[in-house]
């Protein structure tokens, strides 16, 4: 197998931009968009949820494209579509128009976020997939912080229209970067359409089926919690401490500590089974959610640190543990099978979170805690399922 140098830094920076502009930004864009369209913020969040469903609808197709054409080409198209969606969003004449723009943004989200970036890393250098995925997510960890600390002043000084146009320009720059990378790497299809290795449910082994269902369930619970909480941290802390500025700081804490978690994974994770790291990560998150019930600012700070570190390691787990059971030749389609139901259910996060949060912060946190406890138990069950990818059977690679 030919191994090529993975453009981990470009892939990592792309995740700051794509997650930040296609998801995190709507925590702050939702209010001015709702005001301009004459609808409630909950309605805008429902539209965002609908856009995220598109990832599930396209997951199987995009997974096949990753295996056939390579992840870098897919990301180029995703950034271009995202630039178009955000650019058109600046016009915001009506709620219907906003929904149409969010449709484009949903397609872009499906084509240029972690799963496609992970596919590129696995295809280019499978033996070093865990380290490369860790580096990619290391960058992505600051996406929420960079976005929330940037979008607020942009909205204040430039208004909604110019802010959306500015975000569109950043997406266009990302499309250009992946066009350059595609030419540099000359990333031909790993297999032609006729030689693409067969991959369908009926030919999977029992171990592969269990791994696929379990990882799909874990990531579904994790992303449902992630999408629900991301939209309401600022609201929750604003109400709890009656200080909007403090709320933004607290909400922004978990981004840098995702980076800390991923740094720990990069430096020390290779000493441990990636599945065990996943168990620890999923345990940190319900612990953090429980601590947030406290009225002490210091406890809230510690909780967001733990939540961020858990989320940081867990993202690496999603990307790499899949590769323990599925080789590079079928990785894209395996992820596609996992993402399809996950994306549809996780897309309900903003709207489900809105409904739960309307009942109060405590019920909201109880439900999120329960979801992550379920994810932790499922992750622990994978420890009894031996890896099947021969490349990672050596302890140093798992």
Task: Report the location of each language-model feature.
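Extracytoplasmic
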Residues: 6-41, 58-62, 148, 227-234
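Extracytoplasmic gate region of multi-pass secondary transporters
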Residues: 26-30, 208-265
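Conserved MFS/SLC helix-loop-helix module at the cytosolic interface between two early adjacent transmembrane helices
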Residues: 57-95
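Helix-to-loop junctions at the C-terminal end of transmembrane segments
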Residues: 58-70, 261-273, 357
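Intracellular juxtamembrane helix-capping segments at the cytosolic ends
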Residues: 111-125, 313-326
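Helix-loop-helix hairpin linking two adjacent transmembrane segments in secondary transporters
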Residues: 136-186
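A late C-terminal transmembrane helix in Major Facilitator Superfamily
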Residues: 144, 328-361
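C-terminal transmembrane helical hairpin of 12-TM major facilitator-type secondary transporters
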Residues: 254, 258, 272-321
């Amino acid at each position: 197998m030919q191994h090529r140098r993975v453009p981990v830094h470009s892939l990592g920076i792309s995740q700051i931009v794509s997650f930040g502009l296609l998801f995190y930004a709507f925590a702050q864009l939702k209010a001015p968009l709702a005001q301009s369209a004459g609808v409630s913020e909950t309605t805008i969040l429902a539209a965002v949820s609908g856009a995220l469903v598109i990832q599930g609808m396209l997951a199987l197709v995009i997974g096949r494209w990753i295996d056939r054409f390579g992840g870098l080409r897919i990301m180029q198209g995703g950034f271009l579509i995202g630039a178009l969606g955000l650019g058109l969003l600046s016009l915001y004449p009506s709620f219907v128009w906003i929904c149409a723009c969010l449709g484009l943004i949903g397609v872009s989200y499906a084509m240029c976020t972690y799963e496609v970036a992970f596919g590129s890393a696995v295809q280019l250098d499978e033996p070093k997939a865990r380290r490369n995925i860790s580096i990619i997510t290391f960058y992505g960890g600051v996406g929420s912080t960079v976005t929330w600390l940037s979008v607020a002043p942009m909205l204040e000084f430039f208004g909604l229209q110019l802010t959306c146009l500015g975000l569109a320009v950043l997406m266009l720059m990302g499309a250009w970067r992946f066009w350059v990378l595609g030419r540099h790497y000359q990333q031909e299809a790993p297999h032609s359409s006729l030689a693409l290795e067969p991959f369908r449910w009926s030919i999977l082994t029992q171990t592969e089926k269990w791994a696929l269902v379990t990882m799909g369930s874990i990531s579904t619970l994790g992303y449902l919690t992630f999408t629900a909480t991301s939209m309401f941290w600022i609201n929750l802390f604003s109400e709890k401490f009656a200080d909007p500025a403090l709320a933004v700081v607290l909400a922004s804490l978990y981004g840098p500590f995702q980076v800390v978690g991923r740094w720990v994974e990069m430096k020390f994770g290779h000493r441990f089974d990636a599945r065990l790291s996943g168990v620890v990560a999923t345990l940190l998150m319900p612990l953090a959610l429980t601590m947030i019930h406290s009225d002490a600012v210091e406890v809230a700070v510690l909780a967001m640190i733990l939540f961020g570190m858990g989320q940081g390691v867990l993202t690496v787990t999603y990307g790499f543990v899949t590769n323990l059971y599925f080789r590079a030749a079928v990785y894209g389609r395996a992820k596609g099978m996992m993402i399809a139901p996950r994306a549809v259910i996780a897309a309900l996060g903003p709207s489900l979170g809105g409904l739960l949060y309307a009942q109060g912060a405590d019920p909201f946190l109880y439900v999120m805690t329960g979801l992550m406890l379920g994810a932790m138990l499922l992750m622990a069950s994978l420890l009894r399922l031996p890896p099947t990818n021969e490349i990672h059977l050596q302890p140093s690679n798992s």
